Amino acid sequence: MKIITCYKCVPDEQDIAVNNADGSLDFSKADAKISQYDLNAIEAACQLKQQAAEAQVTALSVGGKALTNAKGRKDVLSRGPDELIVVIDDQFEQALPQQTATALAAAAQKAGFDLILCGDGSSDLYAQQVGLLVGEILDIPVVNGVSKIISLTTDTLTVERELEDETETLSIPLPAVVAVSTDINSPQIPSMKAILGAAKKPVQVWSAADIGFNAVEAWSEQQVAAPKQRERQRIVIEGDGEEQIAAFAENLRKVI
């Protein structure tokens, strides 16, 4: 059983600065870290490894120079995966969901897999698209929002996911892609033994060419900026008549 758990390196949000002049975001002092939502996917994959005999867990990520960081690689491997594959290329530096999913799908095909796990979204964009797109590109079953994994056999994964007023139990034929929610587990903090052992685990570094990736984006991100700050108007409308309601609605329209 080959399980791939995908993760993304994202800037530590507490170190992101805002340029007051134009609202642009300054990431220069923000260290990269594992996306919080992907920690749940890594933990879920390693828990499955304990249930399935001879299962192997491979952590997989695509990105730019952040993936060259040895500390970041050790952090991932200390959480339980048996090996790490990183696909590093300049074109993935600010990759959008479609590009990321295409690269992950190509890398997963090259590595081989029975099951792919990922978080519901990423800590930076939280587009909630990548997992679904990977399944679509690979033309295999894909389920998102999974809050519990019930069982795993050689050909079926049984899971639960919470809906608004009910709980679904789904049997998914393998191979498949599953995006897990934060309710599925509480990621463990790696022990010192696990951290030291992470340095001995294998790491494969691939490029876009190694996975046959040569996508052309139909659109590209031009700028990321914080919303402009506006002073509070402090408009007080007294009364509950039709005129006051109309005045309230008019002021509301101005700020929407």
UniProtKB/Swiss-Prot annotation:
PROSITE patterns: ETF_BETA. Pfam families: ETF. This is Protein FixA. Pathway: Amine and polyamine metabolism; carnitine metabolism. Belongs to the ETF beta-subunit/FixA family. Heterodimer of FixA and FixB. GO terms for biological process: carnitine metabolic process. SMART domains: ETF (SM00893). Gene3D superfamilies: HUPs. It comes from Escherichia fergusonii (strain ATCC 35469 / DSM 13698 / CCUG 18766 / IAM 14443 / JCM 21226 / LMG 7866 / NBRC 102419 / NCTC 12128 / CDC 0568-73). HAMAP family: FixA. Disulfide bonds: none annotated. Required for anaerobic carnitine reduction. May bring reductant to CaiA.
